[in-house]
Amino acid sequence: MERFRRYLKGDISLWGVILFFALLSFLPVYSSSSNLVYLERTGISTRGYLIRHVGLIAAGLLIIYLIHRFPYRYFRPLARLGLLLSWILLFFALLKGSTIEGANASRWIYIMGISFQPSAFAMIILLMYVASYLAEVYETKYSFAESILPLWLPVVITLAMVTLPNLSTGAMMYAMVLMVLYIGRYPIKYILGSSILAVLLFALFMLVVKAFPDAFPHRVDTWKNRIETFMSKDKEENYQSERAKMAIVSGGFWGQGAGKSVMKNLLPQGSSDFIFAIVVEEYGLLGGSALILLFIIMLVRFVVISMKATTIFGKLLVLGVGIPIVFQGFVNMGVSVGLLPVTGQNLPFFTTGGTSIWMTCMALGIVLSVSAKSVKSEERKVKNEQRSEVSEQRSEVSEQRSVNSEQRSDIDERI
């Protein structure tokens, strides 16, 4: 155990949860990939998709390890550089991005043959930047006008480029920004004012899109159709949602067994948006509940690590990059059970795709970097306490020796 602790720093419970997620993802991904083999017809077998997923997980764990060894104080200057890089990637995706799995918006770019979704990277960087700004002004008084350029301008630029091709990610990103602002003691009146302004700007954007539909093809129609489909009682329109519910019901308490899902062949997005339904069908309510419990444990560890962090930046950074992982997981599960409209949000570790896994691992590496510093501080505190105890014991021994010598001298005088 000591050998592992020498290399794996930070919260050991979070490390355990991460490894559980990684191991539990293999069988569902292997099972659900049979539908990908049929739909994509690329010549890759289910075993090939499993090997690919194992490789992505292995690379993700390496990302966690490398980042968690990096002192998190260096993330503050890197956040500004990362923000510029994310804007370049987002702009390139808007201009020359590709569509994957039927999406009608350019969300992906290819780097060395690997598909990459810049919005996932942009979310982590933006929340890191917001945490850095709030840490800088934490003890100072400032007006809303003074925070427009350093805070809101980067937020608006990032959200604008993310929301156009991906409304659900943009909405989640804005919600996470507001959460970090609230925890970082940004004045509530400024938060409310900016939220009202955001609603007005979004309404104006919708009017512009309606007035010039050729400039923004299909986007408003897609958002509208998803909401209407969710509200509709027509089972034909709710094809995927209905099949997902059927998969969950057929799973029962114990499930059909690993690889025995029937609905995976009827769900076009069974390996991504609705993979939780496949998990419940094969492993039952018991397996689905275990997955939910893992997300809850992960959330608890994020809160504990944040409370133990020794700096304001560390506290905000953990919650800023950590909570979106849990939030994204619950949104994906909510879509599968029919509580939410289809959003396109991934189930961390389970959804096929390198971007989802690697960006999740990047965020977890940042959290563990903060945790490693806290653990190191605690270890130093314990060592200092032990040293003080040893010094006190030594002083007591020396005092006892002096008392003994005095007693001996008294005895010698009497003799």
Per-segment meaning from a language model:
Residues 1-3, 143, 330-394, 399-415:
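A juxtamembrane structural motif centered on a specific transmembrane helix
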Residues 2-18, 75:
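N-terminal membrane topogenic signal
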Residues 19-22, 42-237, 277, 281-337, ...:
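Hydrophobic alpha-helical transmembrane segments of multi-pass inner membrane proteins, especially
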Residues 20-34:
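Alpha-helical transmembrane segments of multi-pass membrane proteins
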Residues 30-46:
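Inter-helical loop and helix-membrane interface segments of multi-pass membrane transporters/permeases
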Residues 166-172, 256-258, 270-272, 340-343, ...:
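Transmembrane helix boundary and interhelical junction motifs in multipass membrane proteins
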Residues 248-286, 313:
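Long extracytoplasmic/lumenal interhelical loops at the membrane interface
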